Amino acid sequence: MLERIKVCFTESIQTQIAAAEALPDAISRAAMTLVHSLLNGNKILCCGNGTSAANAQHFAASMINRFETERPSLPAIALNTDNVVLTAIANDRLHDEVYAKQVRALGHAGDVLLAISTRGNSRDIVKAVEAAVTRDMTIVALTGYDGGELAGLLGPQDVEIRIPSHHSARIQEMHMLTVNCLCGLIDNTLFPHQDD
């Protein structure tokens, strides 16, 4: 058991090192995409499943409340939090549409969809991205593995942050770190002189 614990930490550290080498440009582009959308009076819609849903909620909460700095609230909506909406859509046998319907209802040109999917193949996330494209939204995608179907849907204005790993737990850990990094970059860019 002790050896397994060490392996978990070692794998996580190795993934962080690989990501630190591979992802700064993509994370910077994503942060600036989010900042420009907010500065233009737009909002960020976020979605994911399971742990990715938790990461989406964490991002939205950090925008609406605060991350590490006291500042005005920023408009972000986690699409996975309204159980009535989710179950109403799913009850009509539209499981794949639980996020896409919300994107079509709430998304506008200039908004950003933050789509989080470990493998990039979750049907409801893929459909949400397709809906965002029809609404002229920009997509920031957090993925892993080979990026899955999601990676193939992204255009030149979109940003994929693909964690360099084929291990779901490590990808999800890095998604949380990436979300925290994005929140910090947004705060530092929009409110550079705010005190903690």
Curated annotation (Swiss-Prot):
Lineage: Bacteria, Pseudomonadati, Pseudomonadota, Gammaproteobacteria, Enterobacterales
Complex and partners: Homotetramer; dimer of dimers.
CDD domains recorded: SIS_GmhA
SIS domain segment(s): 34-196
GO biological process terms on file: carbohydrate derivative metabolic process; DNA replication
Membership in a protein family: Belongs to the SIS family. DiaA subfamily.
Name of the protein: DnaA initiator-associating protein DiaA
Function: Required for the timely initiation of chromosomal replication via direct interactions with the DnaA initiator protein.
Keywords, in A-Z order: DNA replication
Molecular functions (GO terms): carbohydrate derivative binding
Short name of one Pfam family: SIS_2
